[in-house]
């Protein structure tokens, strides 16, 4: 079953004197429920631009992004719902940590979803467990964590929203071989246990 797809997706960036330059043009792609998909390409080829369209952070100049057959840019309500259903973790997500504790950082997304405190707590603890963060980690400042732990805490923040689609933009960038294997292993486990699509 197709969970997320694009139809003739095109996005232009203004390039000063040169005018508009196509970052992505007429992209048609389908992502099926429960699959893991990798998107590869050279630096500047539009990978991150495409990913940012998939949860509505960028709006296409033409074309559509469909989540379970519905255009995510149809209206504000649909777009807001899509951002919770399609979780996006940016490249170097550890630079987005900002709360005073890891627990509060992971709970940020679920709180914004309007969930009650018991459900928020359940999601935070489940996401922390997925990424291998202990109760002691949850009490710490995110700035006291190692680089790999910060990365896992940031990914847990997206996982805590329990998205149908989890998008990770270069999740292993800048990590050593052991750190890369840890991240890839947790992504595989997450997909196996939740049935989510992972891009």
Q: Residue spans of the language-model regions?
A:
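The feature captures the beta-strand-to-loop junction immediately N-terminal to the Walker
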Residues: 40-42
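Helix-to-loop junction immediately C-terminal to a conserved catalytic motif
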Residues: 55
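Conserved ABC transporter NBD signature motif
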Residues: 63-74, 82
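Conserved ABC ATPase "signature" region
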Residues: 118-136
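Conserved ABC ATPase signature
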Residues: 141-145, 149
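Conserved catalytic motifs of ABC-family nucleotide-binding domains
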Residues: 162
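Catalytic Walker B motif of ABC-type/P-loop ATPase nucleotide-binding domains
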Residues: 166-169
């Amino acid at each position: 079953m197709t969970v997320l797809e694009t139809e003739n997706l095109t996005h232009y960036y203004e390039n000063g004197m040169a005018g508009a330059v196509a970052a992505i043009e007429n992209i048609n792609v389908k992502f099926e429920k429960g699959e893991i998909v990798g998107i590869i390409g050279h630096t500047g080829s539009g990978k991150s631009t495409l990913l940012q369209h998939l949860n509505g952070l960028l709006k296409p100049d033409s074309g559509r992004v469909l989540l379970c057959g519905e255009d995510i840019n149809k209206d504000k309500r649909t777009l807001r719902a899509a951002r919770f259903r399609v979780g996006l973790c940016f490249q170097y997500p550890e630079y987005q940590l900002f709360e005073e504790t890891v627990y509060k950082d992971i709970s940020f997304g679920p709180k914004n979803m309007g969930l009650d405190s018991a459900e928020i707590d359940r999601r935070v603890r489940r996401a922390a467990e997925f990424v291998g963060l202990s109760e002691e980690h949850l009490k710490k400042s995110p700035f006291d964590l190692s680089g790999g732990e910060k990365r896992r805490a940031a990914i847990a923040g997206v996982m805590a929203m329990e998205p149908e689609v989890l998008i990770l933009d270069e999740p292993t960038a800048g990590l050593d071989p052991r750190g890369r294997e840890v991240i890839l292993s947790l992504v595989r486990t997450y997909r196996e246990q939740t049935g989510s699509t992972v891009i």
